[in-house]
Amino acid sequence: MKIAVINSGSSSIKFKLYLMPQSIVLAHVHVEKIGETSSKITFRHTDKKEVFSNKIDTHHEGLRVINDILKEYQIIEHFSSLDAIAHRVVHGGDFFKSATLINEDVIYKIRELIPLSPLHNRANLEGILVSLKKAPSVPQIAVFDTSFHASLPKEAYLYALPYELYKEHKIRRFGFHGISHAYVLKKVAQEMQKNLHGLNMITLHLGNGSSACAIRNGKSVDTSMGFTPLEGLVMGSRSGDIDPQIVIYLQKELGYGLDEVEELLNRHSGLIGVCGEIDLREIIKRDDELSHVALDMMTRRVKKYIGAYMALLGRVDAIAFCAGIGENSSEVREKILKNLELFGIELDTKANEKNLTKISKQTSKIEVFVINTDEELEIALEAEALLRA
C-alpha cells in the first residue's frame, strides 16, 4: 500500500511517500518559499539527495512539481495511482477524535476552526483542497494534532471560566503536537518492552513550538498547550503561560490593538522576546545575561511541568524528549533534569552527551529517553489503520 503524507504550510509543502505496512520511505520532497521569487525543492530518494530552485507561485504548482519529480524517477506515474493521501491538520477542535476520511463536512469543519489556529489550519486546508483536485478518486485522510488529547478528562480540558463559554463557544483546552506525542509513546513502549496501554510517562516535545504531555495508561490526561498552541512552555517566539491580565494592560494602558497583541504573543515573545534570538544553539553559545536568563526561563518552565505531571500521575515509568531541541540539545536536557534525583530521575551524562536513545542510569527509577519523533510516519500509520478498519 502506497500512502502519501502531506504537511502543508503557509509557504511550504512537506511530502513523504510510504510503502505500508513496511514503513519504507519511497520518496521525500520538501518545497519551500512558495510564492517567493525563487522556491527551493529538496528531493530525497533512497540514498540520493537533490536540491534545486524553481519559481512556484501556488500550492497547486508545488504539488504538480512533486508529481513531475516522482514520475521522472519512476516512483509513481500520478497521484491518482496512490492508495491514499493523508494530511496533517493542526486543529480538529471538538469535532475529530481520530483520523478521518475527508468529505465536504470535514472540509467545512476544518475551515470553521481556522480562527483557533490561523497560522496552520488555513495552510493545511489549502493542501487538502489542492490534493483533492489532483487526485479526486484517491481516499484522502485528515490526521489531527489535537486528536491524541481527546482523552483529556473534563477537569483537565475545562478552564475556570463561566461554563457557558465552553457550552456555547467550545472554549476549552485542546492540546497540540498530539501526533508527535502519540509516536513517542509507541517508541518508548517498544524500548521498554511494555504494553503502551499500561505505560505512565511524560513526553516533552521541545522545538520552536514546545509542549509537554502527561500520559496515563497510554492516554493523554494533561498537556501544556491549550485552546491554542500559545499556552504552556516558553517557546521560540511564543510566550507560553502568562498572567491574562497582561493582555488587558497592554491594550488599556499601553494602547496596543488586538492584532498587535496577537503578533506580540505569537511572534515576538518567548526566547526571541527575552534575548533577541530564536535559535537555542546560538543562545547557548552567547555569554550575555539575557541569553542566560532566556535559557533558564525555558528550562525552568519545563521542569515545573515535569513536577506537576509527576504529582498528577503518581507513578511515572519514563520521560521522553523529542523534536529539534529535545533530540539534539544535551545541555538543555541536563539543565531540565538537574536536581531531580530525589524524584528517581538519574541522568547518565555520558549517554546524554552522545544523544543515545536511553540517557538515564541503570539505577534510575524513572527511565529517560531521547526519541527521534516521526510525525509523518505516525500519520501514515494512522491512515493505514483507518483504511484497514
From Swiss-Prot:
Cofactors that this protein relies on: Mg(2+); Mn(2+)
Pathway the protein acts in: Metabolic intermediate biosynthesis; acetyl-CoA biosynthesis; acetyl-CoA from acetate: step 1/2
Cell compartments where the protein resides: Cytoplasm
Keyword Transmembrane helix recorded: no
Keywords for the protein's UniProt record, in alphabetical order: ATP-binding, Cytoplasm, Kinase, Magnesium, Metal-binding, Nucleotide-binding, Transferase
Signal peptide feature range: none
Cellular-component GO terms for this entry: cytoplasm
Gene Ontology MF annotations: acetate kinase activity; ATP binding; magnesium ion binding
Residues the entry annotates as binding ATP: K14, H205, L206, G207, N208, G209, D279, L280, R281, G324, I325, G326, E327, N328
Ligand binding (Mg(2+)): N7, E375
Site (Transition state stabilizer): H177, R238
Similarity comment: Belongs to the acetokinase family.
Function: Catalyzes the formation of acetyl phosphate from acetate and ATP. Can also catalyze the reverse reaction.
Protein name: Acetate kinase
Source organism per UniProt: Sulfurimonas denitrificans (strain ATCC 33889 / DSM 1251)
Gene symbol of the encoding locus: ackA
